[in-house]
């Protein structure tokens, strides 16, 4: 496979060279084992035994726990976080092929506090459970907040059913507050920044110090494990719903609405003032970074002039009724970058975003569905949303986005609601949606997207051609010739034939297809998809600890005409682990091993070519140990290499590239 062969684009002995752009999947290289099978088994046993010995020598770290967040709800009907009760469902968990109802959560003031399993204080107000019949099979779950407000969808009156529930729980947050540093705006391709609070982006706006977003970013800065940071941020994003409940019951199945009654929940993430600053200070181009569109009389119009989107042009289009869509705001906003860079590890798939600003009394886009899982974060103003189920089974979990629909193409919405600041709306791929501003109020929202073409079908699409190729090489049954007369009974014109030869032919195909699983290079294709994810990923954002203990925090500087504090070196006694969990992947290509990494990625999608280091065979087991032992520390002298030189060479190369951190600062 030409695009994956070892060539001059590799990194050799620490020298960085660009690799050519990868080619589409082809045959033999991905199926090649890195070593003979028996040796690989022995090496894996060796690595496993070393890891077991390492764990026996050290105390169990809290970061080594499974990254999944423990749910506060067991089975349906148990109380959710914040006193919200989940509506019981006698049918149990829905299979993937069926779509359940819409779920709505009303976040109480208690649940709006920063949540933690510690320091729980019982509140006085009992929770309530409501069932609303605004659409067929629609389900609305509401907490005890007296200010709750539901938008009716011109249907029969809702039925309200009182239900007893456990008392709401209040979370003590004072212990989680800590000071953070604000980052200055940075260019799209730089060294990783520190995780900190919301950024003003040079707009001069006053950001609230004690906002929910500020508090969660401060909390993340204190969590040493990147996988736990990702889990915690996602828990905050969908709070008060437990992540376990969301993934088991709702992910890829149902639309979800979370009401928080807290307009400050996302404050500091993005704003119209930040957008104005970006238009003034950045090279924003119409069509590439910014779209201007409007939906009038059942038709969508895109009114992008050529060239740069200067404030005069952009705001004139806005005044003319156009919605402004900022593509890839993470390239311009440090806070959005921080937000997505942490969350991408939760999804195991690229996390992207767009920002939409819609003027009052207007609609920017026609009804349509997308090919991504969408999380809508309402930042400013209000917007009326209508969400519809997939019309036919082929649209469920759609693989591609739809064309624009007319109103006549739509049925009754499964959800109709007005989003206000702090609210969250989730809907799966294939759910049709449209949104409009009313009542003289503008709207600003950010859509977080993920899971584009990340399906079993996409995986098998890469596996099966390689499996057929391997089967033909290794099994003579796949090389036997077709019957000379097969065209006499096979094909569409013979589809109704009862010829026994046709039955035998179909049975032979089924037998051969069943045997393909034995030849499928599943691990090799998984590595290739992981490599693609590494290239798709945003560069990591570092905590204060990660920066201080990595090459990014070394005190080397220019002073008095010469560099000072040069010479810090790793030794065999230095304890190290990977900088973060998802920043690197070891991949076999063309009989060689390469470590692909994210720390030099750009905030602009695929602006940089994939970056990698070549790992030599004598260092392969040590590299695997480092990748698999995170977040536990490993002594450089305990790395499974034949020589001390190989141990120090590997550790130094990784440290100098910003891929390792040390237990103690180097001096």
UniProtKB/Swiss-Prot annotation:
Catalytic reaction equation(s): N(6),N(6)-dimethyl-L-lysyl(36)-[histone H3] + 2 2-oxoglutarate + 2 O2 = L-lysyl(36)-[histone H3] + 2 formaldehyde + 2 succinate + 2 CO2; N(6)-methyl-L-lysyl-[protein] + 2-oxoglutarate + O2 = L-lysyl-[protein] + formaldehyde + succinate + CO2; L-histidyl-[protein] + 2-oxoglutarate + O2 = (3S)-3-hydroxy-L-histidyl-[protein] + succinate + CO2
Residues bearing PTM N-acetylmethionine: 1
Q: Pull one GO CC term from this UniProt entry.
A: nucleoplasm
Quote the Pfam families the UniProt record gives: JmjC_2, RIOX1_C_WH
**Do you know which InterPro entries this protein is assigned to?**
JmjC_dom (IPR003347), NO66-like (IPR039994), RIOX1/NO66-like_C_WH (IPR049043)
What cofactors does this protein use?
Fe(2+)
Q: Where is the composition biased (Basic residues)?
A: 12-22, 35-44
Q: Which family does the record assign?
A: Belongs to the ROX family. NO66 subfamily.
Query: What's the protein here called?
Result: Ribosomal oxygenase 1
């Amino acid at each position: 496979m030409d695009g994956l062969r070892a060539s001059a684009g590799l990194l050799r002995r620490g020298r960085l060279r660009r690799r050519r752009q990868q080619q589409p999947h082809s045959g033999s290289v991905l199926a090649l084992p890195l070593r003979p099978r028996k040796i690989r088994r022995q090496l894996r046993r060796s690595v496993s035994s070393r890891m077991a010995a390492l764990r026996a020598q050290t105390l169990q770290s809290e970061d080594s726990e499974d990254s999944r967040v423990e749910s506060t709800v067991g089975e349906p009907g148990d109380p959710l976080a914040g006193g919200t009760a989940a509506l019981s469902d006698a049918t149990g968990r829905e299979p993937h092929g069926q779509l359940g109802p819409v779920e709505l959560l009303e976040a109480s003031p208690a649940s709006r506090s920063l949540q933690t399993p510690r320091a729980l204080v019982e509140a006085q107000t009992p929770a309530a459970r409501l069932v609303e019949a605004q659409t067929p099979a629609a389900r609305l779950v509401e907490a005890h907040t007296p200010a709750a407000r539901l938008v009716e969808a011109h249907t029969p009156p809702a039925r309200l059913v009182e239900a007893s529930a456990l008392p709401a729980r209040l979370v003590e947050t004072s212990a989680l507050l800590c000071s953070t540093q604000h980052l200055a705006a940075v260019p799209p391709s730089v060294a990783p920044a520190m995780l900190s609070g919301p950024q003003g982006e040079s707009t001069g706006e006053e950001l609230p110090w004690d906002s929910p977003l500020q508090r969660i970013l401060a909390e993340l800065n204190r969590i040493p494990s990147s996988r736990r940071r990702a889990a915690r941020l996602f828990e905050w994003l969908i709070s008060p719903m437990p992540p376990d409940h969301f993934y088991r019951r709702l992910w890829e199945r149902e639309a979800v609405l979370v009401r928080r009654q807290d307009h400050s929940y996302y404050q500091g993430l993005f704003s119209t003032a930040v957008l104005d600053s970006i238009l003034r200070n950045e090279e924003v181009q119409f069509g590439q970074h910014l779209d201007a569109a409007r939906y009038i009389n059942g038709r969508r119009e895109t009114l992008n002039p050529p060239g740069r989107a200067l404030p005069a042009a952009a705001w004139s289009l806005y005044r003319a009724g156009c919605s402004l869509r900022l593509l890839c705001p993470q390239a311009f906003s440090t806070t959005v970058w921080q937000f997505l860079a942490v969350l991408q590890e939760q999804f195991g798939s690229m996390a992207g975003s767009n920002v939409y600003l819609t003027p009052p009394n207007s609609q920017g886009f026609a009804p349509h569905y997308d090919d991504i899982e969408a999380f809508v974060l309402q930042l400013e103003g209000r917007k009326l949303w209508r969400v519809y189920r997939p019309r036919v089974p082929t649209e469920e979990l759609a693989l591609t986005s739809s064309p624009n629909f007319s109103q006549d193409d739509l049925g009754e919405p499964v959800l109709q609601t007005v989003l206000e600041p702090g609210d969250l709306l989730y809907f799966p791929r294939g759910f049709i949606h449209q949104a409009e501003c009313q009542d003289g109020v503008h709207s600003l929202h950010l859509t977080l997207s993920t899971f584009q073409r990340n399906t079993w079908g996409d995986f098998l699409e890469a596996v099966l051609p390689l499996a057929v190729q391997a089967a033909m090489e290794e099994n003579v049954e796949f090389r036997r010739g077709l019957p000379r007369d097969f065209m006499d009974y096979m094909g569409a014109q013979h589809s109704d034939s009862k010829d026994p030869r046709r039955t035998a032919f179909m049975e032979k195909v089924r037998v051969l297809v069943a045997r393909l699983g034995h030849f499928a290079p599943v691990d090799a294709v998984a590595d290739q998809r992981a490599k693609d994810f590494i290239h798709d990923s945003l560069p990591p954002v570092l905590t204060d600890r990660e920066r201080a203990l990595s090459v990014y925090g070394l005190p080397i500087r220019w002073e008095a005409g010469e560099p000072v504090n040069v010479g810090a070196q790793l030794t065999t006694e230095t304890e190290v682990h990977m900088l973060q969990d998802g920043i690197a992947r070891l991949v076999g290509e063309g009989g060689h091993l390469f470590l692909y990494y994210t720390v030099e990625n750009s905030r602009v999608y695929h602006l940089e070519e994939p970056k990698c280091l070549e790992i030599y065979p004598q260092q392969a087991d040590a590299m695997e140990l480092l990748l698999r032992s995170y977040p536990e520390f490993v002594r450089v002298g305990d790395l499974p290499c034949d020589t001390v030189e190989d141990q120090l060479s590997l550790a130094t190369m990784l440290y100098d590239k910003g891929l390792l951190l040390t237990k103690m600062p180097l001096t």
